[in-house]
């Protein structure tokens, strides 16, 4: 991973998961069953360069949900919240 890159997994935005299971945003801005394409679309709408990969979250190795590498120089938590608000798939 290069400097200025953030790895985002769809589980960060999944309202069905608990914080212990990997969700990183509050439930009120989380999405229902987001996938890597939803995260990628949200990043592109925000004007953030990104690239999808066929990898999985280490804790969810059997799901093969993919991941997104975003080029972002700010804090990862700020990026995660921006993306969560931009994802169109909601509860």
Curated annotation (Swiss-Prot):
- Single GO molecular function: 7S RNA binding
For this protein, the record's InterPro entries field holds:
Signal_recog_particle_SRP19 (IPR002778), SRP19-like_sf (IPR036521), SRP19_arc-type (IPR022938)
> Which Pfam families would you find in this protein's record?
SRP19
Please state where this protein is localized: Cytoplasm
Q: Which domain of life is it from?
A: Archaea
Q: Which GO terms describe its cellular component?
A: signal recognition particle
- Biological process, per Gene Ontology: SRP-dependent cotranslational protein targeting to membrane, signal sequence recognition
Which proteins does it associate with, and in what oligomeric form? Answer: Part of the signal recognition particle protein translocation system, which is composed of SRP and FtsY. Archaeal SRP consists of a 7S RNA molecule of 300 nucleotides and two protein subunits: SRP54 and SRP19.
PANTHER family named among the record's database cross-references: SIGNAL RECOGNITION PARTICLE 19 KD PROTEIN, SIGNAL RECOGNITION PARTICLE 19 KDA PROTEIN
Question: What is this protein's function per UniProt?
Answer: Involved in targeting and insertion of nascent membrane proteins into the cytoplasmic membrane. Binds directly to 7S RNA and mediates binding of the 54 kDa subunit of the SRP.
HAMAP family (alphabetical): SRP19
**Family label:** Belongs to the SRP19 family.
Q: Under what name is this protein listed?
A: Signal recognition particle 19 kDa protein
Native species of this protein? Methanoregula boonei (strain DSM 21154 / JCM 14090 / 6A8)
């Amino acid at each position: 991973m290069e400097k200025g890159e953030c790895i985002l997994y769809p589980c960060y935005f999944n309202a069905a998961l608990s914080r212990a299971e990997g969700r990183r945003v509050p439930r009120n801005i989380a999405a229902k069953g987001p996938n890597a394409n939803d995260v990628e679309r949200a990043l592109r709408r925000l004007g953030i360069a990104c690239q999808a990969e066929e990898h999985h979250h280490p804790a969810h190795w059997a799901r093969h949900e993919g991941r997104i590498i975003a080029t972002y120089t700010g804090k990862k938590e700020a990026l995660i919240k921006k993306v969560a608000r931009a994802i169109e798939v909601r509860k």
